[in-house]
Structure formats: C-alpha cells, structure tokens
C-alpha cells in the first residue's frame, strides 16, 4: 500500500510540473496586431463563415500565413480587449499613406 501512495504522489508532482510549464509559456507570448491585406481579410471572413474555427484549413487558402497567425488575427480582430491595438495600428497606417 505504501508503494501505491508513493506512485500517486510522483504522478501528481509530474502533472503539476507539466501544467505550470504550459501556463508560463502561454503567458510569455507577446501578441502584436497582425496586418492583413483587404483580400486576406475578406478571404478569412468568408472562409470562417463556411468552415468555422478550422484555422489550418483557412491557412491553406491564405498564401504565406500559418494557422496560428490567422487564429491570432481573428481573436485580436474580434475581441474588445484588443481594440486599443487595432485603433493604434489603423491610425498609423491611415496617416502614413499619402493620397494619390
């Protein structure tokens, strides 16, 4: 019986160590707003309407983009928490492009 308790204790220590490492990795990622062209945005919105959150399938249609980039773009584009980054990026591009 003593041996089974020791195995349970070891297993629970490994599990807790594993989960702590995962959260530290996720929290350390710095997200910056991803700039997409109008064609890429349009394609992402249309594909999302058709297939939903299947980011790997959508990334196969958008040339040069990975599934994680498209998912991050979608989250940042549609969440209220990231709206201040959107405004700052669009404001920068609006004033940096001169009219024809």
Swiss-Prot record:
Localisation: Nucleus
Alphabetical list of SMART domains matching this protein: SANT (SM00717)
Stretches assigned to the Myb-like domain: 37-74
Keywords attached to this entry: Developmental protein, DNA-binding, Nucleus, Repressor, Transcription, Transcription regulation
An example Gene Ontology molecular-function term: DNA binding
Cellular component per GO, a single term: nucleus
Tissue expression summary: Expressed in cotyledons, petioles, rosette leaves, hydathodes, cauline leaves, stems, pedicels and flower buds.
Entry's Gene Ontology BP terms: negative regulation of DNA-templated transcription; negative regulation of trichome patterning; trichome patterning
Pfam families: Myb_DNA-binding
Gene3D superfamilies (alphabetical): Homeodomain-like (1.10.10.60)
Note: Plants over-expressing TCL2 does not have any trichomes on rosette leaves, inflorescence stems, cauline leaves or floral organs.
Subunit structure: Interacts with GL3.
Xref: PANTHER family: MYB-LIKE TRANSCRIPTION FACTOR ETC2-RELATED, TRANSCRIPTION FACTOR MYB51-LIKE ISOFORM X1
Purpose of the protein: MYB-type transcription factor involved in trichome cell specification. Acts as a negative regulator of trichome patterning and formation. May function by suppressing the expression of GL3.
Designated name of the protein: MYB-like transcription factor TCL2
């Amino acid at each position: 019986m003593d041996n089974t308790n020791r195995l349970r204790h070891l297993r629970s220590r490994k599990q807790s160590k594993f989960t702590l490492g995962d959260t530290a990795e996720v929290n350390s990622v710095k997200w910056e707003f991803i700039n997409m062209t109008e064609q890429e945005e349009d394609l992402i919105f249309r594909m999302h309407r058709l297939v939903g959150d299947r980011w790997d399938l959508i990334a196969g249609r958008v040339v040069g983009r990975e599934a994680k980039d498209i998912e991050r773009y979608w989250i940042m584009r549609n969440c209220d928490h990231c709206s201040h980054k959107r405004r700052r990026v669009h404001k920068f591009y609006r004033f940096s492009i001169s009219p024809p």
